[in-house]
Every structure is written in structure tokens, then in C-alpha cells.
């Protein structure tokens, strides 16, 4: 069994359902300290949602004047769902048909193990490496993400810590290892809209105001609106409704209000304030009586082609023969926080077809090549 596979299996055995870490970071800390890393635990969150974060750094011969390459990842995993639907224990790594099964196999314990072993090999080969290496690991990525990476970033920013490059181990590949990496992500802006009416008997509509009827034309306009055209890196901004709640459950009562949940996934071609203003203008045009609460989940971020993307692309092609595609599709990630203190942030990991699913798995044939790609990035940027 290879070192990467062994560490991956060790991490999968730990039932680290968010925000639990279940000793994953202690395993990493032991191995990193043996390499000369300085490790710092940053614990945050209320007693009923305690989050464990690890910041570990090893300075190169150039000290703080040299480049710093960080790896960011999360030890927490999503819940398993119905255990009876799994073909094996989700927390007992199991091999079938060339695949390693277990919760977190793809998202993202294989990536964490791969980078740790890559660093072990790199430090052994280059004990006097010029640049610095860091790990930013959290147990609050799959949850609300209020006390995870964002808290570490705040602490690093407060003391003036500079990151030059960051690789996030998210599972970005699609059909084969290395066919896609993420060099940015769209922003996320959510709204909870409550349109008010006047409740009454459905047979006497003149005695009330139906908020569903009043809201419908505005919702149709919002759904049809072209928010922007996107740009060379991002698709056009998308507005989608996720939930509509209205009525008492009775079929003879016009409701007093209707609640609509919606979300923007927006590109760098739009801003949160600009989107908010346009939504309010449409609602006001339809003369609705409403309240609207906004939640900004994250700003979009983008890493144009540069040292990090070039090094990663070259490492992928050297190991796999695949020419990778830079993409900004998909949901948000902790990159939205890290981009505030790091100019070059890229996500790369194994194929994502089974993440968050029953029988999550990773193909064993990709595990050590993933590690080799990570080592290739280290060799190209900080040796």
C-alpha cells in the first residue's frame, strides 16, 4: 500500500461529519511537525458547533522574503444519508472494482493525503527548499463556514501574513484526473422576499389582496432579466428561485403573505450592490408591499493565467498527459475567503462525480498521480 493510500484510508476511518474533525488534524499535525512545520490550532465557534482549524507553516531558506505556497482543505465531510443504501460502511475504507469507497474519499480526504505525502517527498528531496509551505485545514467547510477558513484568514490578515499561491484540494476533475481545474468561482447572493397581502375568504377576493397574484408578474420579470453577459472567465449571472411558501394549507383562504427564497450566482461582471438595486427597482415598479433580507455568501474571485496556473497545468500534463481546462463553474468554495489574502488561488483534485452521494468513491489509479501532480507544483514554484 502506498503512503498516500494509507493516509487516505486513515482519514476516511475518522467520522468527521461537519463540524467534527475526529482527530484528522492531529494526524496531519504529527506528520507535519516531523518535517519541521510550526503548527497552530485555531478553534472557533459556539460550544454546540465547535470548529477545529489548523495553520501549519515551514519556512524555506529565503524566509519571509521567499514565496509561500499554501494548501487549503477541509477534514469535515457531509452526512452519510441512509446507511442502508450504502454497499459498505461509509467510514470503513473499502476497495471494489478498482475504487476506494468511503465518505470523504473524493471530497476531500484523498487530496489532503496527497498533498501531505507530496510535501514529505519534496522536503526529503529538497531539505533546503527556497520557498515556504503552509497548510490551512478546517473542519467547517461543508457546514455554514462561519468559523472555518474565514477565521484563519482573519487571523493571518491581522498579523500581516502573506500568501503568494494557494492550491485548494477540491475535487475539480470531471471525467479523468486533471481534465479541469478551477481558477475562480462565482459569487453567491441570496434573498428572502416576503410580499404582503391581506388574508380573506377565497370567495370574497375583493375583501383582501392576494400576495401570490401580486408577486407573480414581478417574479416573472426577475426570472427573465438579463443581469449581465458574463465575460471571458465567467458565464452570465444567474437568478433562480429555490422556494415559494404561501397559504395556510386551506383551499378556501387567500394568504396574507408569500415568501420567496432566491439566489444569484454572479460573475465579476456584476456587483452585489448593483444586483440588489436592480431587484428593488423591479419590485418597486410593481408597487409591491414587501420586505427583503439579503445574505452575501461570497464575492466572486478569479486567478488569471500566471505562475500558479502554469505550474499546475504543466504538472498535470507531465503526470497524466492531459491538457487541463481552466473553469469557474460550480458552487462556491473556501477560495472566496483565501482570495482576500492570496493573489493566486486555484482548486484541483480528483473527479467529483460521486461527491456527497451514497457510495462516494475515488478511483485508486488516480490517488498517487494526484500526489505526483501536487509535488510537481511544489517543484516548479518553491524548490
Curated annotation (Swiss-Prot):
Zn(2+) 1 binds at residues 74, 107, 170. GO terms for biological process: diaminopimelate biosynthetic process; L-arginine biosynthetic process; lysine biosynthetic process via diaminopimelate. It catalyses: N-succinyl-(2S,6S)-2,6-diaminopimelate + H2O = (2S,6S)-2,6-diaminopimelate + succinate. Its cofactor is Zn(2+); Co(2+). Binds 2 Zn(2+) or Co(2+) ions per subunit. Keywords: Amino-acid biosynthesis, Cobalt, Diaminopimelate biosynthesis, Hydrolase, Lysine biosynthesis, Metal-binding, Zinc. It comes from the Bacteria. Its EC number is 3.5.1.18. One of its GO terms (molecular function) is zinc ion binding. It is an enzyme of class 3 (hydrolase). Zn(2+) 2 binds at residues 107, 142, 356. InterPro entries: ArgE/DapE_CS, Bact_exopeptidase_dim_dom, DapE_proteobac, Peptidase_M20, Peptidase_M20_dimer, Peptidase_M20A. NCBIfam families: dapE_proteo, PRK13009.1. Belongs to the peptidase M20A family. DapE subfamily. HAMAP family: DapE (MF_01690). Homodimer. Catalyzes the hydrolysis of N-succinyl-L,L-diaminopimelic acid (SDAP), forming succinate and LL-2,6-diaminopimelate (DAP), an intermediate involved in the bacterial biosynthesis of lysine and meso-diaminopimelic acid, an essential component of bacterial cell walls. This is Succinyl-diaminopimelate desuccinylase. The lineage of its organism: Bacteria, Pseudomonadati, Pseudomonadota, Betaproteobacteria, Burkholderiales. The gene is dapE.
Amino acid at each position: 500500500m502506498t503512503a498516500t493510500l494509507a493516509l487516505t484510508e486513515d482519514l476516511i476511518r475518522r467520522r468527521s461529519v461537519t463540524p467534527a474533525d475526529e482527530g484528522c488534524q492531529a494526524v496531519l499535525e504529527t506528520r507535519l511537525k516531523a518535517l519541521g512545520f510550526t503548527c497552530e490550532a485555531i478553534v472557533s465557534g459556539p460550544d454546540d458547533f465547535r470548529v477545529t482549524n489548523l495553520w501549519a507553516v515551514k519556512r524555506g531558506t529565503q524566509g519571509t522574503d521567499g514565496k509561500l505556497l499554501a494548501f487549503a482543505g477541509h477534514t469535515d465531510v457531509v452526512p452519510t444519508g441512509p446507511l442502508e443504501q450504502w454497499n459498505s460502511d461509509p467510514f470503513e475504507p473499502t476497495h471494489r472494482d478498482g475504487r476506494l469507497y468511503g465518505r470523504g474519499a473524493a471530497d476531500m480526504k484523498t487530496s489532503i493525503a496527497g498533498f501531505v505525502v507530496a510535501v514529505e517527498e519534496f522536503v526529503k528531496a529538497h531539505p533546503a527548499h527556497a520557498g515556504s509551505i503552509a497548510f490551512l485545514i478546517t473542519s467547517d467547510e461543508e457546514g455554514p463556514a462561519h468559523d472555518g477558513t474565514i477565521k484563519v484568514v482573519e487571523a493571518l490578515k491581522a498579523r500581516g501574513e502573506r500568501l503568494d499561491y494557494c492550491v485548494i484540494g477540491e475535487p475539480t476533475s470531471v471525467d479523468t484526473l486533471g481534465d479541469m481545474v478551477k481558477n475562480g468561482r462565482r459569487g453567491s447572493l441570496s434573498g428572502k422576499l416576503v410580499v404582503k397581502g391581506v388574508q380573506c375568504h377565497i370567495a370574497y377576493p375583493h375583501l383582501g389582496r392576494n400576495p401570490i397574484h401580486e408577486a407573480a408578474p414581478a417574479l416573472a420579470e426577475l426570472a427573465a432579466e438579463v443581469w449581465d453577459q458574463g465575460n471571458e472567465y465567467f458565464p452570465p449571472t444567474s437568478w433562480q428561485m429555490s422556494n415559494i411558501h404561501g397559504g395556510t394549507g386551506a383551499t378556501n383562504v387567500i394568504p396574507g403573505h408569500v415568501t420567496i427564497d432566491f439566489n444569484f450566482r454572479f460573475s465579476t461582471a456584476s456587483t452585489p450592490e448593483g444586483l440588489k438595486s436592480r431587484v428593488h427597482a423591479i419590485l418597486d415598479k410593481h408597487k409591491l408591499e414587501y420586505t427583503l433580507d439579503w445574505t452575501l455568501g461570497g464575492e466572486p474571485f478569479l486567478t488569471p493565467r500566471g505562475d500558479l496556473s502554469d505550474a499546475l497545468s504543466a504538472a498535470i500534463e507531465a503526470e497524466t498527459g492531459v491538457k487541463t481546462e481552466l473553469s469557474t463553474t460550480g458552487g462556491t468554495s473556501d477560495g472566496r475567503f483565501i482570495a482576500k489574502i492570496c493573489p493566486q488561488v486555484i482548486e484541483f483534485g480528483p473527479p467529483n462525480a460521486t461527491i456527497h452521494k451514497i457510495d462516494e468513491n475515488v478511483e485508486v489509479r488516480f490517488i498517487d498521480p494526484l500526489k505526483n501532480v501536487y509535488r510537481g507544483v511544489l517543484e516548479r514554484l518553491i524548490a
